A protein has these predicted regions:
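Hydrophobic alpha-helical transmembrane segments of multi-pass integral membrane proteins
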Residues: 1-419
Length: 419
């Protein structure tokens, strides 16, 4: 049975609320100068908290609740790891807000490796005990998610020697190391972590799947996640088209092929899941799935060099892509999981108002970012009141999270486990 620790998920949602609030301030800074705010420091704190405070903490809660037995979930080590990680998140956040990214904050990031390594080791050890020799497809995806989670930290660990050797914080090697971390977080840990939870849901409801097909799907996605990193190398060395073609035509087409192989199976799975799902959960999961398909298409489209250059130089497109993965895929799926298994069902007509506001806000922001990026691309320039409009739409995200947290508190008697 899948369970959720209400206290932990509320902490993760509070982290997400701070992330969204910071993002709103960053938008407002383009309308009115905020003399008290160091933009770069806030921006760095924003993405750090998004990755470690929201996605990682929420995944931590959901993975433990989905993959471990109640007895394993109650072990002291998981409670200790959660609160140590949350304490470190607060320390890193305050460091970044006040001092920005430095050797000290890199050291703090390395501390995450220790805590995350402890979590991964503990989960894998307990999974071996609870699952025995039973090869579950969800476990296989989870192991790959953990592989990418740990692999991504090579990007952070390498920053210190790069700065010492090259004495240039913004050197090409610094760029490649930071992108290494982000790439394997967004395209590895996020995606495979979500898929592991999705397949665990399928197993939980006793739905049979073609495991051979989905193992082929898994291998192709794994190869594509590794190959698509070459796009970052191309952006670092734009004269070398071979890197672009490897990433976009190779990695992109592999992902499209992977999705094509299981497209009918996914349709069948959604059909069999429908009777089990909250109506809001079903909509959110389809939203995340469509966003995932759009992500794959975009990775193929930028195989054309001019489009790849546009994607890099027009900041609106870059932000829209990161938001597509972080908000439209990862966050939407995590909300869907919370609605489904934290029992936030439509007890009242307005129970999921926060979910609706969140979905509308992120979709509107994505469309506006892509529209403004296209206007810049064709030489039209900025639309009238663009910054005011995107600020107002972004404001809906923290408001929606407040509503979601309120619902978690209001129905805290559901889905609770040992605190």
């Amino acid at each position: 049975m899948i369970r959720i620790n209400n206290t932990w998920i509320k902490i993760a949602l509070l982290n997400f609320l701070i992330v969204a609030t910071l993002g709103t301030f960053l938008r407002f800074a383009f309308i009115k100068e905020l003399t008290w705010m160091d933009y770069l420091h806030f921006q760095t704190a924003h993405w750090h908290l998004a990755v470690f405070g929201w996605i990682y903490q929420a995944m931590y809660v959901f993975i433990i609740g989905a993959f471990l037995t109640p007895e394993q979930q109650a072990q002291k080590k998981y409670h200790t790891l959660f609160w140590l990680n949350q304490t470190l998140i607060i320390i890193v956040f305050l460091t970044l807000i006040t001092k920005g990214y430095s050797f000290f904050s890199v050291d703090e990031d390395i501390c995450f490796v220790v805590l995350i390594g402890g979590f991964v080791f503990s989960i894998l050890k307990d999974l071996k005990i609870s699952s025995g020799s039973n090869r579950l497809i969800s476990n296989e995806f989870l192991k790959i998610a953990f592989f990418f989670l740990l692999l991504s930290f090579l990007g952070i660990i390498s920053i210190i020697p790069i700065e010492l050797l090259f004495s240039a914080k913004r050197s090409i090697f610094y760029y490649l190391s930071s992108q290494f971390f982000l790439h394997f977080q967004y395209n590895g840990w996020f995606i495979f972590g979500i898929l592991s939870l999705f397949f665990k849901m399928i197993e939980n409801y006793g739905i049979k799947i073609n495991t051979d097909k989905f193992r082929q799907f898994k291998r192709l996605l794994l190869a594509a996640a590794l190959i698509t990193y070459f796009l970052n190398i191309y952006w670092g060395y734009p004269g070398h088209l071979v890197f672009l073609w490897i990433a976009s035509l190779g990695g992109g087409m592999i992902q499209i092929t992977a999705l094509f192989i299981v497209r009918k199976d996914i349709s069948m799975i959604f059909g069999e899941l429908k009777p089990h799902l909250n109506s809001v959960t079903a909509v959110l999961m389809k939203f995340a799935y469509i966003s995932f398909c759009i992500k794959l298409i975009l990775q193929v489209v930028i195989a054309y060099p001019d489009l790849a250059s546009v994607a890099l130089t027009i900041r609106n497109y870059t932000i829209a892509y990161f938001h597509l993965v972080f908000l439209c895929i990862a966050s939407v799926f995590l909300f869907a999981w919370n609605v489904q298994f934290n029992k936030l069902k439509l007890i009242q007509k307005n129970s999921n108002t926060g979910i609706y506001v969140f979905s509308f806000s992120i979709l509107s922001v994505e469309l506006l970012l892509f529209l403004q990026g296209t206007l810049l691309w064709i030489g039209v320039g900025f639309m009238t009141f663009y910054y005011e409009l995107i600020f107002l739409l972004t404001l809906g995200i923290p408001i929606s999270i407040v509503l979601i947290i309120f619902q978690n508190i209001k129905h805290s008697n559901f889905g609770d486990i040992n605190k």
